[in-house]
Amino acid sequence: MATGTREEIRIGQLAIRFLVEGKDSGGSVAIFEFDVPAGAKVPIAHSHDAYEETIYGIDGVLTFTLEGRTIEVGPGDALCIPRGAVHRFDNLHSATSRTLAIVSPGILGPDYFREIAAVAKAAAGGPPDPVAIGEVMRRHGLTPAP
């Protein structure tokens, strides 16, 4: 099986690297690693109906909100996010976190993050256009939470 491009996609200070893309796994899974700097609050609360997402902590701690519950994911911790569950995460701690995300089936790919990065870059350091962010999210199967 071929592996992902390992291209680093940057959205502000957030860095994403795909290790396995859906096209590499026959569509069964996509795996990406992401680094979130201390103090970062990302992304917009959202859900996805077409795939499950499992998060595995490597370094640092991310604080997830999943269906209204607060869950900290640190090194060695795993969090399963079922289809349709509203979630988001922040790095409320003093160190950068590194986390692995496993998406099954592997329908979320680097194109989504590239498009989000382009919207963020167009904001020139200001807040990204929420309408444009929502359009990109919906195009890639994510539903922004109200």
Indicate where each model-derived feature is located.
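Short acidic-glycine-tyrosine-enriched beta hairpin
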Residues: E8-I9, G68-V86
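A short glycine-rich, His/Asp/Glu-containing loop-to-beta-strand
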Residues: I9-A45, Y51-E52
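Structural motif
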Residues: A15, T54, V61-T63, T70, ...
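Short, conserved beta-strand element in jelly-roll/cupin
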Residues: E33-P37, S47-T65, I102-S104
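Short beta-strand segments
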Residues: P43-A45, L66-I71
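Ligand-binding loop in jelly-roll beta-barrel domains
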Residues: T63, R83-P110
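Acidic/histidine-enriched, glycine/proline-rich intrinsically disordered or flexible terminal extensions
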Residues: R114-P146
